[in-house]
């Protein structure tokens, strides 16, 4: 009798909702996006370990829309004046000449590097002539106001919203119709329809899809802030980077003043541009002559110091490379690098020993690039 009652309840529930028996769960690789039927320790497609996570699929919905007939390419017109200038020349250069209306821009970086500071400064500049909406999923309205006062941002057409529910965020953007909206961050927003928590693969994917659709429908340029993993890549599925129009990385050492804004993907401009900033107590300040700042503390004719010319994007930079060699007190010598790839430094040490005859097997070697700049240019060898 009990089993019969349970069967009746299950059939009744499926008749009413239909979602209990239709709930779909998949397993997706966060590195390559491959879908597998069950959890595996190693992805069969890309070979990465511990990258497969459980994913949840939203119930299918019928999307309403109007049919738009195809247009000839030569009949489509646009103007370069449509780009929105932020009055931050380093950022405008990286974006290819300003913000494109209706674009979706993703910016990632380490914790405390200055992503939220940069976003709030963009809001302050644009709010003088444009309508801007700043959506914070990590701070309250009062906390954002406190940070804005510290940065010296005056009141304008800047609206603040502390919200995590993506459905309410969609309603706010459609009602306010801002020129630029910022979501800080994509890992904190969620859909209540999904049982998984904020930051999961399914939540990030659905939030990105919704943001992309909103940007195209409302012609609102949307910035989304993304967290990074300990390996330095953006947290979440790789699909996140594929869907957005622009991907920016905010780099630099947290305890150094200089920051680099690097373009990884840009559908509206070059990916060979970088922006250089200096973090001060009043926020980020543009660095128009980076070589002058990077070499300002260099001592003349100092031992263990050399100046290297590297190419960051399309801009040549002069950086100071420092090296220190001392006798080791252990069986294995210590090798430590900052701003230089460790494997490349090991290769150079091997060349010095093999070709130039330097005996470095009993020496500790420390290599540092002044200013917190990361050097990847082979010409700096």
Locate predicted features.
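Conserved inter-motif catalytic segment of the P-loop NTP-binding fold
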Residues: 102, 110-113, 121-122, 126-210, ...
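Walker A/P-loop
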Residues: 116
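Substrate-engagement module of ASCE P-loop NTPases
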Residues: 202-223, 227, 243-254, 353
């Amino acid at each position: 009798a009990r089993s019969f009652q349970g069967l009746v309840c299950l059939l009744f529930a499926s008749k009413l909702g239909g979602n209990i028996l239709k709930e779909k769960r998949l397993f997706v690789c966060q590195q390559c996006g491959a879908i597998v039927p069950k959890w595996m320790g190693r992805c069969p497609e890309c070979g990465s370990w511990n990258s497969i996570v459980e994913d949840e699929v939203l119930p299918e919905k019928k999307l309403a829309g109007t049919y738009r007939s195809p247009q000839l390419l030569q009949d489509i017109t646009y103007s370069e004046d449509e780009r929105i200038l932020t009055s931050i020349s380093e950022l405008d250069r990286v974006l290819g000449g300003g913000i494109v209306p209706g674009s979706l821009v993703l910016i990632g970086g380490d914790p405390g590097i200055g992503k939220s500071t940069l976003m709030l400064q963009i809001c302050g500049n644009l709010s003088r002539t444009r309508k801007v909406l700043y959506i914070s999923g990590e701070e309250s309205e009062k906390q954002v106001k406190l940070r804005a006062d510290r940065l010296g941002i005056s009141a304008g057409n800047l609206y603040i919203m502390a919200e995590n529910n993506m459905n309410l965020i969609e309603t706010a953007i459609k009602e306010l119709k801002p020129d630029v909206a910022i979501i800080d961050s994509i890992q904190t927003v969620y859909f209540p329809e999904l049982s998984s928590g904020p930051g999961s693969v399914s939540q990030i994917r659905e939030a990105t899809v919704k943001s992309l659709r909103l940007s195209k429908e409302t012609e609102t340029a949307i910035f989304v802030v993304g967290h990074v993993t300990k390996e330095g890549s953006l947290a979440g599925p790789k699909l996140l980077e594929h869907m957005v129009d622009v991907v920016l990385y905010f780099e630099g050492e947290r305890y150094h003043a200089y920051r680099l804004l690097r373009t990884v993907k840009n559908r509206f401009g070059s990916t060979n541009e970088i922006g250089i900033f200096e973090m001060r107590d009043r926020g980020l300040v543009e660095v128009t002559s980076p070589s002058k700042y990077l070499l300002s503390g260099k001592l003349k004719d100092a031992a263990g110091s050399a100046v290297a010319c590297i190419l960051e994007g399309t801009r040549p930079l002069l950086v100071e490379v420092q090296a220190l060699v001392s006798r080791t007190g252990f069986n294995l010598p210590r090798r430590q690098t900052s701003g230089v790839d460790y494997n490349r430094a090991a290769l150079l040490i091997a060349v010095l020993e093999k070709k130039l005859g330097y005996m470095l097997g009993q020496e500790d070697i420390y290599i540092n690039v002044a200013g917190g700049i990361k050097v990847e240019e082979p010409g700096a060898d």
